[in-house]
Amino acid sequence: GISDGETSDFSLDNKYALESGIYIANQQTVSDKISLQYGLRISMFNYMGPGSAFEYFDDVTPGLRRGVASEEEFGRWETIQQYINPEPRFSIKYQVNKSASIKASYNRMVQYIHLISNTSASNPLDVWTPSTNNIRPMKADQIALGYFKNFKENAYEASVEVYYKNIIDLVDYIDGADLLINRFLEGDLLAGDGRAYGA
């Protein structure tokens, strides 16, 4: 015979956030050979209720989840945490001749949504989470330098470019972190700095 099966429904509370921003930019020709582009974006991110916000103990023991120090309930539309960040960008172009140019640029980028990915487990798992009172937005400063060459009256372009990126508050997790249906996921997360470079 067939026995009645039992099922359990596990789910986590939804998280709510609102992101907004303004951006201004300008393009300026300095001379026949030099042109500039520059701008500024101001982004604002609000992590909001309804929901619970946790505060964790500051002490970090390698490989162990931080303990919950307190829990506070927030109502609908109440701001739990707010972040405001300037994101400047600047680029300069030097026209070597009609078909070749050199470009240099700087960008500050801020990311408020984080992908917590565990690809080493037997069942790969991706978890998306917004920036919260415990997870700061990730910031990246990138500089780049490139040489660009057009061919056949600008029908084709070839280029080589090098870049360096410095990353602040890069999110990672402790060894043995529980990413699946974990109400206290933030206690398993770490923030660090990183860098990337290439061509």
Residue spans for each PLM region:
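Flexible coil/linker segments and helix-coil junctions enriched in charged and small residues
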Residues: 60-66, 189-191, 199
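Signature of Gram-negative outer-membrane beta-barrel scaffolds
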Residues: 1-97
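Tryptophan-centered motif/residue detector
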Residues: 41, 45, 127-131, 173
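Flexible, surface-exposed loop regions and adjacent strand-edge segments
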Residues: 1-8, 52-64, 117-127, 174-184
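Membrane-embedded beta-barrel scaffold of Gram-negative outer-membrane proteins
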Residues: 95, 101-113, 117, 134-197
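Extracellular loop and loop/strand-boundary signature of outer-membrane beta-barrel proteins
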Residues: 5-12, 25, 72-78, 127-133, ...
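Hydrophobic, lipid-facing positions within transmembrane beta-strands of outer-membrane proteins
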Residues: 18-24, 86-90, 131, 141-145, ...
